[in-house]
Regions:
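Gram-negative bacterial Sec-dependent N-terminal signal peptides
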Residues: 1-18
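Ser/Thr-centric signal marking residues that sit
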Residues: 4, 64, 175
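C-terminal cap/substrate-recognition subdomain and adjoining C-terminal extension
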Residues: 19-25, 29-35, 39, 54, ...
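Short, solvent-exposed loop/turn elements at domain surfaces
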Residues: 43-45, 66-68, 210-211
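Short loop/turn motifs at secondary-structure junctions and domain boundaries
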Residues: 47-51
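Asp-based phosphoryl-transfer active-site loop
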Residues: 55-70, 260
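Secretory-pathway/luminal and periplasmic proteins that interact with or process carbohydrate-rich
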Residues: 66-68, 108, 192, 199
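A metal-dependent, Asp-based hydrolase signature
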Residues: 70-71, 76-155, 159
């Protein structure tokens, strides 16, 4: 009897010590809704069961899996690349947009709008082989840190969302990124950061040019045939790259609304929708209708209420924002 009691105690202690797969989430209705949907979708005896081959789920990246404020990380990469490359390009010397970048005059850069952004993207994302571009992104990720948090960008994935990705995969779901960010940029880091392989990452892209070389072959990036994977283009990209309608969608802005509506209208299965609402100025940023750069969230909140989607209140629903082992918490002063 004594041994039995000791054994029961050990089992109890071990069970109590086991970490919850969503330990970075507070025990709120948002977390409970996730767990309930996953349970029902994976229970073969439940009317909401989804066969494993149909368990495709899609995530936005900027603002959903990692921060997009005060500017997106890819835009920061563009600015840093212009500064790094400028000495090699004397023809840029009299360009007012480049001068603004070199002076950290972000107001002038922002005022240049989409036309200015495309120009900077042409300077940093075209007429370069895909292999060289990947090396540049990897080097930047390994050597640059976020100005506010002092962490490397690849350490700033939201811990609750990274846990959610793992949790879904453990339950037989296939996780995809469908984002307005550059497809090549995200593919460099997606597997290491999120466990999502490059072939399951879809983003904005332009056509490349193939050619043979003395050492084999290469693809050079161009700005031709650019496709902006945002808003109404997201469902189009899902159709082109995935070939089937998702059963769950996770986003944070009105730019994700079409993707979520496309998912919600899946005629065969009970779907799930979740929006991350940035409400934590102390641990991250707080915005919706007036974001620092991208991520406006107005219409999405209205539709979420109508459709019964989960709206995550970052301040209340997340126990941690970043993994403290990688990016120790820093609150606003």
């Amino acid at each position: 009897m004594k041994r039995t009691l000791i054994g029961m105690l050990l089992v109890s202690l071990c069970g109590g010590a086991a970490a919850s797969p969503l330990s970075a989430w507070n025990d709120t209705p948002a977390k409970q809704a996730i767990e309930t949907w996953v349970h029902d979708a994976t229970d073969a005896n439940n009317h909401a069961f989804i066969p494993p081959e149909k368990r495709y789920v899609v995530f936005d990246n900027d603002g959903t899996l990692w921060p997009e404020a005060p500017i997106t990380f890819q835009i920061q990469f563009v600015l840093d690349e212009v500064k790094r490359l400028a000495p090699e390009h004397p023809e840029w010397q009299n360009d007012p947009l480049v001068s603004a970048v070199l002076k950290n005059d972000l107001k002038t850069v922002a005022a240049a709008g989409e036309k200015g952004l495309l120009k900077l993207l042409a300077f940093t994302h075209s007429d370069i082989t895909t292999d060289e571009f990947n090396k540049r992104v990897a080097s930047w990720i390994d050597t640059h840190k976020d100005a506010r948090f002092g962490c490397q960008y690849n350490q700033m994935g939201y811990q609750p969302m990274r846990q959610l990705l793992d949790y879904l995969r453990e339950n037989g779901f296939k996780t995809w990124i469908i984002s307005g960010g550059g497809i090549d940029f995200m593919r460099v880091l997606s597997e290491k950061m999120y466990g999502i392989p490059p072939e399951q990452v879809v983003g904005s892209f332009a056509l490349g040019e193939f050619s043979l070389t003395k050492d084999g072959s290469q693809i050079r990036k161009t700005m031709q045939g650019a496709f902006n994977d945002d808003a109404a283009n997201k469902p189009v990209a899902i159709h082109l790259f995935m070939g089937q309608r998702p059963v769950a969608a996770f986003g944070n802005s009105d730019g994700d609304l079409a993707m979520m509506q496309y998912t919600a209208s899946n005629p065969d299965y009970k779907t799930f929708g979740l929006l991350v609402h940035h409400t934590d100025a102390a641990r991250e940023y707080a915005y919706d209708s007036h974001p620092p750069a991208s991520g406006k969230l107005v219409e999405g909140l209205k539709v979420a209420k109508e459709k019964g989607w989960v709206v995550v209140d970052m301040q209340k629903d997340w126990k941690t924002v970043f993994d403290p082992a990688q990016c120790p918490a820093k609150t606003a002063q």
